[in-house]
């Protein structure tokens, strides 16, 4: 799938937050994807025609970006193009939560990705949340499956172990690196990468499982190189971008279908 992605080089439109825009763009370029970053409402009709997929990230939400996201969903939905929603911090404020619900209720979102607190809040499971990180008491399988069922989406829940569900099946993906939680934008780039893989129009559940596995293996490879060179967060970030650009043989042993 990665080889096909790089051959096709899809154009992926990102309505993302200003904290991570450059990192997301560089990460997509490393993947072999052409990034397009725009939140100008007037551009949405034209950009929907030329882009292969859309990723919406509400990390720095405001009234203008809300209107832009709504218009973008309307345009991409009409063209039957994949849309990924990353409801960043939706468990932290009423504005984020209400906006996430409104975007999901548009029925244009094909994939919802977030952490346990974010997905948990959207399905009514109480989670303890601080900033963009989360701790939860409900089982991850319950949260991700319920999210997929409630919103008729592929649900992707990231963390130490990733979980992906279509509402019927749940698959878990292990591996990765603790450094992913120590850099800004890892989740935001993950959402954009989700949109990239979905642009290939393959089975969406399998596409998200493959993406999660690749992302974790790239992170593990970057951590290994960083530690070998006595590095930490900073060097991990650079090695991670390198790893995203390299061919990686997926380890299927890290993927498990849950009961």
Swiss-Prot record:
Cysteine pairs bridged by disulfides in the record: none
GO biological process: thiamine biosynthetic process; thiamine diphosphate biosynthetic process
Entry binding sites for ATP: 113, 158
Matches recorded under InterPro entries: Hyethyz_kinase, Ribokinase-like
Reactions that this protein is recorded to catalyse: 5-(2-hydroxyethyl)-4-methylthiazole + ATP = 4-methyl-5-(2-phosphooxyethyl)-thiazole + ADP + H(+)
Necessary cofactors: Mg(2+)
Record keywords: ATP-binding, Kinase, Magnesium, Metal-binding, Nucleotide-binding, Thiamine biosynthesis, Transferase
NCBIfam families in the record: PRK09355.1, thiM
Protein's UniProt name: Hydroxyethylthiazole kinase
Lineage: Bacteria, Pseudomonadati, Campylobacterota, Epsilonproteobacteria, Campylobacterales
